[in-house]
Amino acid sequence: MADVVVGIQWGDEGKGKIVDRIAKDYDFVVRYQGGHNAGHTIVHKGVKHSLHLMPSGVLYPKCKNIISSAVVVSVKDLCEEISAFEDLENRLFVSDRAHVILPYHAKKDAFKEQSQNIGTTKKGIGPCYEDKMARSGIRMGDLLDDKILEEKLNAHFKAIEPFKEAYGLGENYEKDLRGYFKAYAPKIRPFIKDTTSMLIEANQKGEKILLEGAQGTLLDIDLGTYPFVTSSNTTSASACVSTGLNPKAINEVIGITKAYCTRVGNGPFPSEDTTPMGDHLRTKGAEFGTTTKRPRRCGWLDLVALKYACALNGCTQLALMKLDVLDGIDAIKVCVAYERKGERLEAFPSDLKDCMPIYQTFKGWEKSVGVRKLEDLEPNAREYIRFIEKEVGVKIGLISTSPEREDTIFL
């Protein structure tokens, strides 16, 4: 059976800590979408690990880790991540169906961002998915055969010829790209496998599989705040499509949310706080992107969006992250509905334009940092947790009270 860990905000919810905390109980940890535009930060024994492509289970020697078919892979960045760990042989596997991000994709991404102003990381994620959908992409499996790779590269060079100048690729692009693969393909080849068959077999044997997503539900290409979204499907349903596991294989769906809310880049954010309180949340919560180091926009918990995300994913339980960031705040707001042109909205709309938050205010608490038992939390903190659980209609299964792995309350 497989369990899914999915972000239910705009990403950066703390999925990495939860996966790291529970990964020891699983045989496989699988990253099922996105690219190196996303980042997980894990603190283990006082050491901070920033992962962009590798699944969070790499810190457990007995855990097998898979990068599945719907992930887009920068081979250079993956090789650099691999070099930071020892003994990944037979512990890390990259799907032969996963698509390869080319330097051209990053150039195209930056070019398009100048006019679209979506707020992308400019790492080539979107353009790589574009080539995938156009059936012209290079897959990881193509790197296993030099002849096939050369054929794919020649087709790529022909296709981009009209755009080389616009994207600033330079006269030596073909030579440089061949050199790029010559340098990195041999390093990555030992990890490329038919992961779909591996996971189907593992599921049939009854092995435990943990599927981890990147970004968050509200960035889903179809169901998020379009056009300010990522280029992949980020919900729990996409875990099946990417891995080859059928929907019957899914058991638990753990939705990850912060006790407040953040967003990186442009796009609507009804509960954003642009006062000094937003700055306080950013500073205390260390809200700066793992990948880009960009400051995150900060605000209050949005229950309209949270209920929508829980419904989309079929969440069976929630993980409430960074409760400690709210320590010491006298009045804590929660967005319980929107107002748009005089109308109260309690359902999440397809367009958030003109949506203003309607808040309910709670009394704060002094300290929750490092607490590991629910009964040790102050009454106001427990009331806040109970309110979220009641309004969303999904039980809270665990609460994080610091970046440390062990500072977690299990309910």
UniProtKB/Swiss-Prot annotation:
SUPFAM superfamilies: P-loop containing nucleoside triphosphate hydrolases
Binding positions for GTP per the UniProt entry: 11-17, 39-41, 296, 322-324, 400-402
Pathway of action: Purine metabolism; AMP biosynthesis via de novo pathway; AMP from IMP: step 1/2
Cofactor note: Binds 1 Mg(2+) ion per subunit.
E.C. number(s) listed in UniProt: 6.3.4.4
Keyword Ligase found: yes
Entry binding sites for substrate: 290-296
Annotated localization: Cytoplasm
Entries under Gene3D superfamilies matching the protein: Adenylosuccinate Synthetase, subunit A, domain 1 (3.40.440.10), Adenylosuccinate Synthetase, subunit A, domain 2 (1.10.300.10), Adenylosuccinate Synthetase, subunit A, domain 3 (3.90.170.10)
Cofactor(s) of this protein: Mg(2+)
Alphabetical keyword list: Cytoplasm, GTP-binding, Ligase, Magnesium, Metal-binding, Nucleotide-binding, Purine biosynthesis
Single annotated GO MF: magnesium ion binding
InterPro entries the record matches: Adenylosuccin_syn_GTP-bd (IPR018220), Adenylosuccin_syn_Lys_AS (IPR033128), Adenylosuccinate_synth_dom1 (IPR042109), Adenylosuccinate_synth_dom2 (IPR042110), Adenylosuccinate_synth_dom3 (IPR042111), Adenylosuccinate_synthetase (IPR001114), P-loop_NTPase (IPR027417)
Catalytic activity from the UniProt record: IMP + L-aspartate + GTP = N(6)-(1,2-dicarboxyethyl)-AMP + GDP + phosphate + 2 H(+)
Residues that bind Mg(2+): 12, 39
Family membership: Belongs to the adenylosuccinate synthetase family.
Quaternary structure (record): Homodimer.
Function: Plays an important role in the de novo pathway of purine nucleotide biosynthesis. Catalyzes the first committed step in the biosynthesis of AMP from IMP.
PANTHER family: ADENYLOSUCCINATE SYNTHETASE (PTHR11846:SF0)
Record's protein name: Adenylosuccinate synthetase
Organism: Helicobacter pylori (strain P12)
